[in-house]
A protein has these predicted regions:
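Conserved, mostly hydrophobic/aromatic
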Residues: 30
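A broadly used, surface-exposed interaction patch
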Residues: 48-111
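Hydrophobic, glycine-enriched assembly/anchoring segments
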Residues: 259-305
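Long, charge-rich C-terminal accessory regions
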Residues: 130-271
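Short acidic, S/G/P-rich loop/turn micro-motifs used as interaction or catalytic elements
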Residues: 11, 34-39, 62-68, 95-102, ...
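N-terminal basic/disordered segments at the start of proteins
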Residues: 1-26, 36
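Histidine-anchored nucleotide/phosphate-binding helix
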Residues: 16-21, 40-53
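Extended alpha-solenoid helical-repeat scaffolds
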Residues: 83-84, 114-130, 134, 145-148
Length: 305
C-alpha cells in the first residue's frame, strides 16, 4: 500500500479531496500533518476520504507550521467532536527521536494509533512501537536491526530532489525505487513519500524567477525506478514577474515531449488537468500547478501497485 505524506495545506488537501473518488481505496492511505489552525478544510477532506472507504492517518501531535510554536493539545478531541471527521481517521503520533518520551507515552491513550518516526529510535522502545497499528520510518535514519524487529512497518523517504532555485533543475532526476524495494522485507506492508513537495515545511513559495512543472513517471522499460521530468521556463529568468508567461513556456515544453512520447506518462487526473490548461493556454496559478503535479504523482503510483 502507498502512503503519500502531505501537509494539511490548501492544495495538498484539495489534491486528496479530488483523488478520493477515483483512486481504489485498497491502494493508498494518506498521512496528513496539520500545519495551521484552520481545521474545516482538513475535516472536509477526512470526510471525503472516508466516504470513499479511505481512513487517513492524521498526526495528532504535529510540530510544523502553526504548531512549531503553538500546542497541538486538544487536536484529536477537536477532530472527534465534529461529526464529519469523528472516527473517520486513524490517529498518528509523531516521534522525534528516542528521547521523545512525551510522544511515546501518548500511545497509551491511543492504543490503535500509528507511529511516525522522524529519526532513529532505541531498542528499549520496541515494545511500545510494536503496540502501534503501524510504524512509519525512514530506513536511512533508523538502525536496520531495529527495523527488522518491528511488526508492521511502512517505509518512507524524502525522495524529491528539491533545488533551492527552479533554474537549477535538470530535465530529469531520479526519484525512488521504494515502490518496488519495500517488498523485500516481510514485515514491511507499505511505502510512502512526500510527492513532489519534499519533507521540509515551507509556508509559501519564493518569487518565481523560473516556473517549473514536475511530472513523475515510471518507465515501462525500467519499472523498478520512478523518475521526474522537470519542465522549466527560461523567459524573463532575471525577474520575479510574468508567472503566467513562464508557466505557458514550461507547459509547451511538457506537451512537446508528450506529443513525441505519448505513452511515457500515465493518463491521470492531474495530467488531464494539465491537458485542459494547455488546450486553452490558461495559467491557473502556481499553487494549482503544484496541485496537478501532486495528483499525477499519487495516481501514477497507485496505478503501478
Amino acid at each position: 500500500m502507498y502512503y503519500p505524506i502531505l501537509k494539511a495545506k490548501r492544495h495538498e488537501l484539495n489534491t486528496l479531496y479530488d483523488l478520493a473518488s477515483i483512486l481504489p481505496a485498497t491502494k493508498y492511505r494518506p498521512v496528513i500533518e496539520p500545519v495551521n489552525a484552520k481545521y474545516k478544510p482538513l475535516i472536509a477532506t477526512i470526510d471525503q476520504l472516508h466516504n470513499n472507504s479511505v481512513s487517513p492517518l492524521v498526526i495528532i501531535n504535529p510540530s510544523q507550521g502553526h504548531f512549531a510554536k503553538n500546542s497541538s493539545a486538544g487536536l484529536f478531541g477537536l477532530l472527534q467532536a465534529d461529526p464529519k471527521s469523528a472516527n473517520k481517521f486513524v490517529p498518528c503520533i509523531k516521534v522525534k527521536d528516542a528521547a521523545d518520551s512525551t510522544a511515546l507515552s501518548l500511545l497509551a491513550s491511543y492504543p490503535n494509533a500509528a507511529i511516525y518516526l522522524e529519526s532513529d529510535i532505541g531498542a528499549g522502545s520496541l515494545s511500545v512501537l510494536n503496540s502501534a497499528s503501524c510504524v512509519l520510518l525512514n530506513q536511512q535514519k533508523v538502525d536496520e536491526s531495529i527495523v527488522d524487529k518491528l511488526h508492521n512497518v511502512v517505509v518512507y523517504s524524502d525522495s524529491f530532489a528539491k533545488k533551492k532555485r527552479n533554474a537549477d533543475y535538470t530535465s530529469k532526476s531520479f526519484y525512488s525505487g521504494l515502490h518496488v524495494s519495500y517488498k523485500k522485507k516481510s514485515n514491511v506492508s507499505g511505502f510512502g513519500d512526500f510527492t513532489i513537495m519534499g519533507e521540509e515545511y515551507l509556508d509559501s513559495g519564493g518569487p518565481a524567477f523560473v516556473v517549473a512543472i514536475h511530472v513523475s513517471y515510471i518507465d515501462a522499460t525500467a519499472p523498478n525506478s520512478m523518475h521526474v521530468h522537470h519542465y522549466c521556463s527560461t523567459v524573463d529568468d532575471k525577474l520575479p514577474t510574468n508567472s503566467g508567461g513562464k508557466y505557458k513556456e514550461a507547459l509547451v515544453k511538457m506537451f512537446a515531449f508528450i506529443a513525441a512520447n505519448p505513452t511515457v506518462y500515465d493518463n491521470t487526473l492531474g495530467l488531464s488537468e494539465f491537458r485542459a490548461s494547455y488546450a486553452i493556454m490558461h495559467f491557473p496559478g502556481l499553487g494549482l500547478v503544484k496541485e496537478m503535479s501532486m495528483k499525477h504523482h499519487i495516481e501514477s503510483l497507485c496505478n503501478y501497485i
